[in-house]
Amino acid sequence: MFPPSYDAFQGVTAIGWACANMAHHFGISLVMTQPITYLLQLQQLAKQGQTRFGCWLRGDAQWQHHLLKTLVPHFAEQPILMLGQTELEGVTCVDYRQGQQWLGRECQLLIVDLTQGWDANSFNAVLGTLVGGGLLLVVGEPTTLNHCARVWLERACHRLLVITPQTVPALPNSDSVTRTNTEQTYTEQRLAIDSIIKVVTGHRKRPLVLTADRGRGKTSALGLAAAELMSSRSMHIVVTAPTLAAVEPLFVHAQRTLPQAHRQRGEVQTAQSSLRFMAPDELLRTQPESDLLLVDEAAALPLPFLKRWVERYHRAVFSSTIHGYEGCGRGFSLKFQSWLQVQRPQMRSLHLEQPIRWAAGDALEQWQNQVFLLQSELPEVALEQAREPLSFSLFSQPECVEQPERLAQVFALLVNAHYQTSPNDLFALLQDEAMTLFVAYQGEVCVGCVLAVREGELDAPTIEAIQLGTRRPKGHLTPVTLANQLGISQAARQSCWRILRIAVHPDCQRQGIGSQLLTHFIAQHHADYYATSFGVSEDLLPFWLANHFVPIKLGSHRDQASGCYSLLMVRGEHLDWLEQAKQQFSAHWIFELSDSLQALEPQIIQQLLPSTVALPQPLIPLELIERYARGGANYESVAVWLYAWLLATAPSLESLSPLLISKILQRKSWAACAEQFQLSGKRQVEQAVRTEILALLVNLQCKYTLPI
């Protein structure tokens, strides 16, 4: 950084002299006026270029407080936010963990107190509220973090402009700060708004894919376009995203444009139109009528969801952050857009590059991208690298801190593979000593990684408290679940490694790298057993089954963001309690199929059935079942025997048809089955059921010579 030219700062120099004169008049020490003068000059420079600057105020608490107290009145007409519950007159203070509640708002001065604690998600959310011409002031030291996480954050803060009671840095070079054309800033956003409106006014089946980096006004454009449509016609618009908080700016901008509208949480209504949020799982389940579907942060949602919505809604916009934790770089383009171009050849796409809230080349945005690895891209895997042998190794926390380029590669894999990776995950990886990171390399390219956490080895009083429901120790999901929900205390006493994430480079998948990673990880990380918990899908489950993990607990509710049921699986040898866990799992999940798991996909049920332990069954009248299959009896008279028979034979069946799963095991209505399998009504559904039962009977007779 170099000091600015004299001409560029005649204005800010005048401010400096004014502050010095004021200090002399009121008896304020020059030790204080030097930082104040500097910060006011810095703000003028920021305003000149609509950019943002960050400063780290390093000094004792009394100096910091006095400096802020003196500075705040200069920002009296502008919104000021402080992250950290320190009382400061004229400043809105929020808990350091609650920055997300400021999504959709703006501030000109953002103060962050590190002594209160550190939450990376909260910090990243609130940093987006700081507009061009604004300043970030970091105060205090990150004393609540352990060594590696603290070193990472301190190094990040040292890359800001560091101010002490004795010294201030040179002002940034004015040549790097150029004035922004406000009209040009909004040109791209206007184009985005018009493109969204065109989805409604143009031909059907021409979805729009809208992509952007953070801060480009993508979500705001969705809200502004929705408001224009609602004001010009009767419109019912549905919005979905991983969380309601992610689309809060959409509703804020829609209401600002529609001052007469009534707004409540996740909804804006006018006399003739509505804009409402629906969680992804609810939207998938209920499939409401809608004139326009807006899917924000689409890259963070499961691909099967997006495909279903494309088929169901013929006027839809899919928007996504390409860099940052909300998106997944080119993975979104590879997975979804390529599929969409085949299914909807008339689709359109638009990428926003111009920032809205700050100027291009913003200093603070570049800093944020570096610190939180927001622009980490998956590296290309060259053909010659793909031929190199795999090497496996531990990537320790100190190595992560000292080798940020390698860490960025690994983290790009994690972000690409998992829809819920967040800034806090980066700091958990650096902070939590129970976590470990295990990586696979081909040459210089990281092609796979395992992130795992050590669990278990709990003492008897803790286990008893867990089983009574009075304690739930953080970071012990598997032993807590086994002790509390399955009543297996022995598992909580034993040691466990739980796999939090496993990721393989998209160019290297289907080559067995994931299985090799697991094998090498288990060989180098001893424990009594290993576990994993994930949103179960027909794509993921076969991988874990093939690697000798067995299911022991299936959640009863879908995750709102992923839309999947959570499945806990374990792997271990000579575990006295494993057979008991398998029997409990079999009884529980089969029982829940007709209740809380009625919406579980038949394909997943097919994959789980072979893991089901055969339970003692009553005498089954096969003759009655055969007569029904051939057209006799009625369904109600044999339903109980069909259910018992399928459960008794399921472990030996290679594949049970989705129709029999839905009607007999999940006990769905005739109407629901007709809709699901596109049949005309009960008669056609029942005929299909009879046909499939007869085929199953014949198949089993051939295999086991059953007397039917």
Swiss-Prot record:
PROSITE patterns referenced in this protein's UniProt entry, alphabetically: GNAT
InterPro entries: Acyl_CoA_acyltransferase, GNAT_dom, NAT10/TcmA_helicase, P-loop_NTPase, TmcA/NAT10/Kre33, TmcA_C_sf, TmcA_N, tRNA_acetyltr_TmcA
GO molecular function: 18S rRNA cytidine N-acetyltransferase activity; ATP binding; tRNA binding; tRNA N4-acetyltransferase activity
SUPFAM superfamilies reported in the protein's UniProt record: Acyl-CoA N-acyltransferases (Nat), P-loop containing nucleoside triphosphate hydrolases
Enzyme class: transferase
Positions that bind acetyl-CoA: 502-504, 509-515
Main location: cytoplasm
E.C. numbers: 2.3.1.193
Entry keywords, A to Z: Acyltransferase, ATP-binding, Cytoplasm, Nucleotide-binding, RNA-binding, Transferase, tRNA processing, tRNA-binding
Binding site residues for ATP: 189, 215-224, 357
Localization of this protein: Cytoplasm
Domain N-acetyltransferase per the UniProt entry, residue ranges: 398-574
A Pfam family reported for this protein in Swiss-Prot or TrEMBL: GNAT_acetyltr_2
GO cellular component: cytoplasm
Annotated catalysed reactions: cytidine(34) in elongator tRNA(Met) + acetyl-CoA + ATP + H2O = N(4)-acetylcytidine(34) in elongator tRNA(Met) + ADP + phosphate + CoA + H(+)
Gene Ontology terms: biological process: rRNA acetylation involved in maturation of SSU-rRNA; tRNA acetylation; tRNA wobble cytosine modification
Superkingdom assignment: Bacteria
Function: Catalyzes the formation of N(4)-acetylcytidine (ac(4)C) at the wobble position of tRNA(Met), by using acetyl-CoA as an acetyl donor and ATP (or GTP).
Family label: Belongs to the RNA cytidine acetyltransferase family. TmcA subfamily.
Protein's UniProt name: tRNA(Met) cytidine acetyltransferase TmcA
Organism: Vibrio cholerae serotype O1 (strain ATCC 39315 / El Tor Inaba N16961)
Gene: tmcA
